[in-house]
Amino acid sequence: MLASAVTDLPSTISQMECLPLDLPLTEPFAIAGGAPSVAHNVLIRVVLSDGTVGLGEAAPFTAVSGETQASTLLALREARARIVGQDVRSLRRLSAILSEVCPDEPAARAGCELALLDAYLRQHRMPMWTYFGGQATQLKSDLTITAGDVPHAIASAQAAYRRGFTSLKIKVGAQTPAEDAERVSALYRGLPSGRDPRSAELNLVLDANGGYSAEQALDLLRRLAAADIPIALFEQPVARQDRLGLLDVARQSSVPICADESARSAADVMWLVQTRVVRAVNLKLMKSGLYETLAMYEVARAGGLGLMMGGMVEGPLAMAAAAHLAAGLGGFSFIDLDTALFVSNHPFHSEAVQEQADWQLAGVRSGHGVTVA
C-alpha cells in the first residue's frame, strides 16, 4: 500500500506505506483465550517531503481485542487517504482523523500515530522519551510466564530468575482455579529461597486476561493465601464487561486489583477512579492508541490510581515506543514491556536497548530509535 503527494512544506506527509510484519515467537504466547506462535503485526512507514522517514508498528491481538492483521491493514488503507498530504506537526489533529476513520481499530491508530510521531521527532532530532517529559531513560521490566503446565511454569520462572528478572507476570485463567493455584505455588516454591539476596525483590503478578468469573478469581486467591504465596497484584480477573464482577473481586480481595481490558479509554479510567474499584490500571498503546493512552494516564494520576505500562504481543519497535512513554512520563510502578524478548527473528535495529529486564534509552538520538536493518 503506497500513496504520495507533492508539496513544498518539509513537514508534509508525502508517503504512507503499510506492510505485514510477521514475527515468529520463541514459544506460544499463551493466555486465557489464545496462544499465538507468530505475532501477525503491521509495519507503518511514513515519509515527509524532506525525506524524513518515520516508522510505526501496529500489534493487533485477536484474543484480546478481536483485531487481526487483515483488519488492521484495511483500516490503515482507509486512513492513508486522509493522512497523506497533511502536516505532521498537527499530531493531535491527525490522531483525531485516525479516531474518526478507524474507531474500532486501536492497534492501527497506535501504529500510525507512532510512525507520525517518529517522523516528527526525527525531523527535529528529539528522542521520544524527551517528547513525553524526560523523567528518566531507564526502566526495569518484568517477564511473562505464559499459560501452560506446572513443569513449564517452574522451568520458565527459574530461567527468568537466572536472567535477572525479579518481577514475574504469571498468566492464569486458562485453567481452573485449582490448577492455576497448583501451578503458581509450584513456580514460587521452585524459586530461590531467602538465602538468595535477590529473593527479597521478588514480585509475582497474576494476569487472568478476563478468564475467570468473580467466584473463580476469589477461589484462586483463597487457595494461594492458604498456601502462603505472596501476590503483589492481580490483573483483570474477570471479563471486560463484567463490572459487577470486578467490583465483587476488588471488595473481597486483600490483593490489589489492576484493570487492563476494563480500561480502554479515559472514560473507562474515570469510572474506575470514581468507583475506587481497582488500585491500578494497565496502559497499552495498542489497546487505546497513543493520545488516548496519554489522556488515560492523566486521569489515572489525578485519581490516585497506580500505573502499569504494558503491551500486546509487540516487536522491538512498539515495545521501544512504550518504554519511551513510560520513562518519559514517569510514575509507573509496574513495567511489563517484555514481548520483544519472545520474538525469535525480526528486521529491526534499535538504539533503545533492552538487556533482559533493563531498558536503556539514553543512546536514542531521535524518535524511538528503531530502524529497519
Predicted feature locations:
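Catalytic core of soluble alpha/beta enzymes
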Residues: 175-320, 344-354
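Structured loop/turn residues at beta-strand edges in well-structured enzyme cores
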Residues: 11, 163, 229, 276, ...
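N-terminal capping/lid subdomain adjacent to the active-site entrance of alpha/beta enzymes
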Residues: 2-205, 209-218, 225, 252, ...
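Short glycine/serine- and small hydrophobic-enriched flexible loop segments
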Residues: 118-122, 298-301, 323-327
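C-terminal alpha-helical cap/extension of soluble enzyme domains
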Residues: 42, 313-371
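Short glycine/serine/threonine/alanine-rich loop segments
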Residues: 85, 126, 255, 305, ...
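Short secondary-structure boundary segments
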Residues: 57-58, 172, 285, 311-312, ...
